[in-house]
Amino acid sequence: QETYYHEFRANSWKYTENGYFFMEEYHPAGYDGPSGYRAFRVVPLNKKCRELNRKYILPFGYTLNKLFTSNWSEKNYDGINFYDVFDRLLSMEEKTDEFKEGKTYEIPKESFETIFQKYFNISAEILQTGTVFHTEIQTYRYRTRGIVYDFAPTPYIPYPEVVSYIENQDGTITLEVNAVWPQKELDQAFCHSVTIRLLDKDRFQYVSNYVSRSEIEVTWYTERLSDEKWEECYGDN
């Protein structure tokens, strides 16, 4: 059943070797509405790849975190902001409503580490090094991003697509992922390999990410507020 119909004149179009058809809608000079770029996958993806994408990659995506745009492994988490990851884990655990903008929270050590260690094989020592940890009260400081000051998501960014996978002998699975960016007409804005450890009871852990190819810079990522800037924005709350 047809629920939406939109007719337009195309300004440009391109078909790629990987089976994508990109099209740009014509807009007159001075137009200030939604983007006119569209991407259509003509060559269908393997059903298993789509399932893997929905389960492991889309929950993080590329918005306000660098989990899939940085190189890291269980031996080296450099380049990853643990608070960005924690934000996404809270969303996956459906606990985002517990925290409000402009407030400082002290999360008990066990609670913070339990959420992380459910999805990552990471020690408490590493987590404490990359966060603000208060030894005397055994808590992690946590502040959400602010809608006004450091949230600022860019609406037109790439989206991930798992195109193949390898089941490894050690019980992990490596997903080959292409970042599709309609606004740039790129079906491989960058490519990365994500290794997942499969556990019992449908559980899993992220093991590593490796960016194998990139044609772009990650210009849409917004850094979290520094302590000084946070006090300037929210100090009176």
How should these model regions be labeled?
Residues 1, 45-147:
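Core segments of small alpha/beta cavity-forming domains
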Residues 11, 148-190:
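Functional cores of ribonucleases/endoribonucleases
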